[in-house]
C-alpha cells in the first residue's frame, strides 16, 4: 500500500518463538504496517498470525539481512525489530552488524530485544 509504513522483523533462531509470540500479541498494530521479514522469521510470524500479510525475503544467513539492509538504505523500511541472541555465535555476524549500522545511519527506530520492541509498538499504536 502506498504511504503505508514498513516494519522489518528478524529473529535469531533462539528468539523466533519470542518473535512469534510478540507478533501474536501485537497483531492488530502490526496489521497497520507493511511487514517484511527474513524467510524463517516471516514463516513463524505467518504461522502465529495467519491474518497478517508478511513479505518473506531470504533467510538471514542466505542474504535476508542484507536485503533488509538495502531496503533501509533506500528508505523502504521505517522501523526494524530484530530479536538478537547475544549468547550464540553467528556465522553471519558481519551481516548483523551491517544491518544495525544501517538502521543507525538512516536513523530509523530499531529494537534489538522484546522490551524495546514493546515500547516501539506501544508508541506506534498511539498514532
Swiss-Prot record:
Binding site for substrate: 12, 16, 38-41, 59-60, 92
Catalytic activity: dihydroxyacetone phosphate = methylglyoxal + phosphate
Domain MGS-like: 1-127
Gene Ontology terms for molecular function: methylglyoxal synthase activity
Active-site residue numbers: 65 (proton donor/acceptor)
Top-level class of the enzyme under EC nomenclature: lyase
InterPro entries: Methylgl_synth, Methylglyoxal_synth_AS, MGS-like_dom, MGS-like_dom_sf
Highest taxon of the lineage: Bacteria
Protein's GO biological process: methylglyoxal biosynthetic process
CC per GO annotation: cytosol
SMART domains to which the protein is assigned, alphabetical: MGS (SM00851)
Pfam families the UniProt entry points to: MGS
Known EC number: 4.2.3.3
CDD domains, per database record: MGS
Record keywords: Lyase
Its biological purpose: Catalyzes the formation of methylglyoxal from dihydroxyacetone phosphate.
Family per record: Belongs to the methylglyoxal synthase family.
Protein name stated in the entry: Methylglyoxal synthase
Organism: Agrobacterium fabrum (strain C58 / ATCC 33970)
Lineage: Bacteria, Pseudomonadati, Pseudomonadota, Alphaproteobacteria, Hyphomicrobiales
Amino acid at each position: 500500500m502506498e504511504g503505508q509504513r514498513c516494519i522489518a522483523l528478524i529473529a535469531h533462531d533462539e528468539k523466533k518463538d519470542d518473535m512469534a509470540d510478540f507478533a501474536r500479541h501485537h497483531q492488530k498494530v502490526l496489521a497497520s504496517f507493511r511487514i517484511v521479514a527474513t524467510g524463517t522469521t516471516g514463516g513463524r510470524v505467518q504461522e502465529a498470525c495467519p491474518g497478517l500479510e508478511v513479505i518473506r525475503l531470504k533467510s538471514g544467513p542466505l542474504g535476508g539481512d542484507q536485503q533488509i539492509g538495502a531496503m533501509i538504505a533506500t528508505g523502504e523500511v521505517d522501523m526494524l525489530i530484530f530479536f538478537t541472541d547475544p549468547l550464540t555465535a553467528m556465522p553471519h555476524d558481519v551481516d548483523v552488524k551491517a544491518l544495525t549500522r544501517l538502521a543507525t545511519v538512516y536513523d530509523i527506530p530499531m529494537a534489538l530485544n522484546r522490551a524495546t520492541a514493546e515500547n516501539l509498538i506501544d508508541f506506534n499504536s498511539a498514532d
